[in-house]
Design a protein with these regions (language model features):
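Sec-dependent N-terminal signal peptides
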Residues: 4-12
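Sec/Tat signal peptide C-region and signal peptidase I cleavage site
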Residues: 13-17
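A cross-taxonomic marker for long C-terminal extensions/tails that follow the last structured domain
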Residues: 18-28, 97-104, 109-171
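Acidic, glycine/proline-rich low-complexity segments that act as flexible tails and inter-domain linkers
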Residues: 23, 34-40
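Acidic/histidine-rich, surface-exposed loop or edge segments in extracytoplasmic proteins
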Residues: 38-55, 95-101
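Solvent-exposed, acidic/flexible segments
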Residues: 54-61, 79, 110, 151
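Histidine-anchored nucleotide/phosphate-binding helix
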Residues: 60-77
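Acidic helix-start/capping segments at beta-turn-to-alpha-helix junctions
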Residues: 78-96
């Protein structure tokens, strides 16, 4: 009987340890009894490409990246085995700028995505800005939120991430 209890505790341990969500208040997800199961020990490296800003609400492209993390952790993948990057160009770059720079570009409004981005950065999500697009939009590196990375271009960021084993989100 003692061995059965020990075995039950050991089997339940990983499930209890991997409950999500990682992010509260954004990145909504649903537990799924999946047929295509993530192999144990597999590290998921995934990159999203986001171009469009959504000035009056959280950026749905950024939130999709959070959902990817939340859904996989809630379905048993250890948080340490989920790596996400977001390559940003176009008007979405504004949503990665500090409050004064954002307000100056958006009629004094507050950045609805800022708190979400900061929390995601704290959890290891990489936000990488296309340097070519930033230059074209007049965004300086010093205006970016702390932790946001600047690449030569979105293309070079994707090439580097692909070489590091990241898959590109197809939609």
């Amino acid at each position: 009987m003692r061995r059965l209890l020990l075995l039950a505790a050991l089997l339940a341990g990983p499930a209890l340890a991997t409950d999500g969500p990682v992010f509260m208040g954004f990145g909504s997800h649903t537990p799924v009894e999946a047929d295509l199961v993530i192999p144990k020990g597999m590290v998921l490296r995934h990159v999203y490409d986001v171009t469009a800003a959504t000035p009056d609400k959280r950026n749905p492209g950024f939130e999709t990246a959070a959902r990817f993390i939340n859904s996989h952790v809630a379905n048993g993948v250890p948080e340490r085995d989920v790596a996400v990057a977001v390559v940003v160009h176009g008007s979405a770059i504004d949503e990665l700028t500090r409050a004064p720079a954002y307000a100056a570009r958006n009629g004094g409004k507050a950045n609805a995505s800022e708190a979400m981005v900061i929390e995601m950065l704290k959890k290891g999500v990489r936000f990488i800005v296309c340097g070519q697009a930033a230059n074209a939009r007049g965004v300086k590196k010093a205006e970016l939120l702390p932790g946001v990375e600047l690449a030569i271009s979105a293309s070079s960021a994707h090439a580097i991430l692909q070489a590091q084993g990241y898959s590109l989100n197809p939609f």
